Amino acid sequence: MTIHSLEDLLAEGVSGRGVLVRSDLNVPLDENGVITDAGRITASVPTLKALLDGGAKVVVAAHLGRPKDGPDPKLSLEPVAAALGEQLGRHVQLAGDIVGTDALARAEGLTDGDVLLLENIRFDKRETSKDDGERLALAKQLAELVSPGGAFVSDGFGVVHRKQASVYDVATLLPHYAGRLVADEIRVLEQLTSSTERPYAVVLGGSKVSDKLGVIESLATKADSIVIGGGMCFTFLAAQGYSVGTSLLEKEMIDTCRRLLDTYHDVLRLPVDVVVTEKFAADSPPQTVAADAIPADTMGLDIGPGSVKRFAALLSNAKTIFWNGPMGVFEFPAYATGTRGIAEAIVAATGKGAFSVVGGGDSAAAVRALGISEGSFSHISTGGGASLEYLEGKTLPGIEVLGRPQPGQTEGGGPA
């Protein structure tokens, strides 16, 4: 599959040309609407800056959160526009709508090197519609914002696994290119799937087994070891017959976990100890117990020091490491030790030459929250769900469409 890149578009020339960019600017906000982790905004800058420096008239589409019933002031991209402007070093206009009169007027008024951010694309229900016609109608209106002669750049890796109007459908209408972020993510994930140096260690955390089931089953036949931590480890411990107290538990997944343990017992690695407490609170005192001796009135919020030591020893010998999901409730300092310990072990292995990939989402947020240098890892992905689905071998709509011939061309590259 040949995917045209941003470099191809820049070589064609973008001066005076309208370019629609789908970025992933879905950053976390606190209760006051202040951005708490601008990592995704930072990751979007290289592609946008290259286009703006080339004289393009850039229109950015992005989402924030999951609006339920149309526009929600709490999910406006206003704080994102301000933060993006600071990082780009230029003013970022924010449209008052998506494809309405304000967006149209602002898009028409753009001059070379200007950038316009559309309001939260998910305020328009057609963006995430299951109806192909509804999505295509929105995509046509988005394409009009950069017409005539416009182009589309896909740079939101965190959404490429979604068949949505601004991710998939618009690429069927405009000449389409992979932005630097998306191209880099594809390169790294291809390396993980096709040219993996052994031993290959996978570290999976997070709360739910159901979210990671596909990637566990896919990677269990490819990896030398899969470390299980986070809230999901308690369902695995329950599958071994252990009591897990009041810990997070997916009862409906116990039989599945038992099957996985039976089938991949030589690959899966579970904690030998955990850190428990009586209530889910940052100030609730921690207690380390064996994984098979969790008191009935306590819940596990982190893996224990013995587990960290074992997992770190395993990781120290790895040549390839993929990590997705924290080992505990890292937002609570008393329960961040497991996540920090695993992160530091991966950093140490990377320093010895291992190829390490942090699979986006909460694990990437944990790296930043714990003050660990992002440059200490080989790659930090911006897409948790997209990374997992790619490694499962699923077709990602937002990637597949980029491999199609440009509008008006045949498979061979000539005119239709």
Swiss-Prot record:
GO biological process, one term: gluconeogenesis
Subunit structure: Monomer.
GO cellular component: cytosol
InterPro entries: Phosphoglycerate_kinase, Phosphoglycerate_kinase_CS, Phosphoglycerate_kinase_N, Phosphoglycerate_kinase_sf
Keyword field: ATP-binding, Cytoplasm, Glycolysis, Kinase, Nucleotide-binding, Transferase
Chemical reaction(s) catalysed: (2R)-3-phosphoglycerate + ATP = (2R)-3-phospho-glyceroyl phosphate + ADP
Protein name in the entry: Phosphoglycerate kinase
Molecular function as annotated in GO: ADP binding; ATP binding; phosphoglycerate kinase activity
Chief location: cytoplasm
